[in-house]
């Protein structure tokens, strides 16, 4: 590992990398049109009025417009039934104009999210949450890869560092980030340890890591002084403080002088998750729905 003693970390600019990815996707959509090929289509389903979900969904629709995808919006009332949603998903599964189906989580409590996610056809599961796609990743033959881990791999590539053989520590074991992230890093040749907020001697694990990915949803969980000199720090956390400021799961100010590379919050991982959703939708259109 490069030693960055008494230096400040290189910032990994997720915003800029995501913008460049969106530009490439938009260019490809234009080329497809010129070749007389279909425009990629994404269907976004939102159930209820959760304000955070509404913001995320509006971002995703705006992203679709920006790259020239056709986006279909389904804003459904909170009391929508499991059966009505199942029927909608079936209809979208059968619609040849739809390459990706996105079901915005969390869903109202009376709905079974697992059953609904499994109802989405694996070749239209652009979030990469279907057990089939997670299984493909586990078996080292990924098809549609979960967006946040996939975006993080793109950020890691941008550092130019060779990940092969690195000690990687993931803090947080969720289905959406931690677990698939572990599989992505195994695939990249890392030695992977998965921790969580109740891990004994979390500081010790973090201190041995050449690469730390923190996705625990707990502000300030990982202290800057735990970070090994020169390590790569990827902070997936996004927590709003009482003063309205967004902070990650890592104490940024104290990690900055120790890390070799670090993602800011906001402007690090978040934009990449959104860009990878578009990348997956394009991939589905180009490779899976020829």
Swiss-Prot record:
Its EC number is 1.5.1.5, 3.5.4.9. Pfam families: THF_DHG_CYH, THF_DHG_CYH_C. One of its GO terms (cellular component) is cytosol. The keyword Amino-acid biosynthesis applies. Pathway: One-carbon metabolism; tetrahydrofolate interconversion. The keyword Amino-acid biosynthesis applies. InterPro entries: Aminoacid_DH-like_N_sf, NAD(P)-bd_dom_sf, THF_DH/CycHdrlase, THF_DH/CycHdrlase_cat_dom, THF_DH/CycHdrlase_NAD-bd_dom. GO terms for biological process: L-histidine biosynthetic process; methionine biosynthetic process; purine nucleotide biosynthetic process; tetrahydrofolate interconversion. Keywords: Amino-acid biosynthesis, Histidine biosynthesis, Hydrolase, Methionine biosynthesis, Multifunctional enzyme, NADP, One-carbon metabolism, Oxidoreductase, Purine biosynthesis. One of its GO terms (molecular function) is methenyltetrahydrofolate cyclohydrolase activity. Transmembrane segments: none annotated. It catalyses: (6R)-5,10-methylene-5,6,7,8-tetrahydrofolate + NADP(+) = (6R)-5,10-methenyltetrahydrofolate + NADPH; (6R)-5,10-methenyltetrahydrofolate + H2O = (6R)-10-formyltetrahydrofolate + H(+). NADP(+) binds at residues 172-174, 238. Catalyzes the oxidation of 5,10-methylenetetrahydrofolate to 5,10-methenyltetrahydrofolate and then the hydrolysis of 5,10-methenyltetrahydrofolate to 10-formyltetrahydrofolate. Homodimer. Belongs to the tetrahydrofolate dehydrogenase/cyclohydrolase family. This is Bifunctional protein FolD 1. The gene is folD1.
């Amino acid at each position: 590992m490069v030693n960055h003693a008494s230096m400040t970390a290189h910032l990994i600019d997720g915003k800029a990398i995501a913008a460049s990815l969106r530009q490439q996707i938009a260019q490809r959509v234009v080329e497809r049109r010129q070749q007389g090929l279909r425009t990629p289509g994404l269907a976004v389903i939102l159930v209820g009025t959760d304000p955070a979900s509404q913001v995320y969904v509006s971002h995703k629709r705006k992203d679709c417009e920006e790259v020239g995808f056709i986006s279909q919006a389904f804003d459904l009332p909170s009391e929508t039934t499991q059966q009505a949603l199942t029927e909608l998903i079936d209809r979208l599964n059968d619609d040849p104009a739809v390459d990706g189906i996105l079901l915005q989580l969390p869903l109202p409590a009376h709905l079974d999210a697992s059953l609904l996610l499994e109802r989405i056809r694996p070749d239209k599961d652009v979030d990469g949450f279907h057990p089939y796609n997670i299984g493909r990743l586990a078996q080292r033959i990924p098809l549609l890869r979960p967006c946040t881990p996939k975006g993080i791999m793109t950020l890691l590539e941008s550092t130019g560092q060779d990940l092969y053989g690195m000690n990687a520590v993931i803090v947080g074991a969720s289905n959406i980030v931690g677990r698939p992230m572990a599989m992505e890093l195994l695939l990249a040749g890392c030695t992977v340890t998965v921790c969580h907020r109740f891990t004994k001697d979390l500081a010790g694990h973090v201190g041995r890591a050449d690469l730390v990915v923190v996705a625990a949803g707990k502000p300030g969980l990982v202290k800057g002084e735990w970070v090994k000199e020169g390590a790569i720090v990827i902070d997936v956390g996004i927590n709003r403080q009482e003063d309205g400021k967004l902070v990650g799961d890592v104490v940024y100010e104290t990690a900055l002088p120790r890390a070799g590379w670090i993602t800011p919050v906001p402007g690090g991982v978040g934009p990449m998750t959104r860009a990878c959703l578009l990348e997956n939708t394009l991939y589905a259109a180009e490779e899976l729905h020829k």
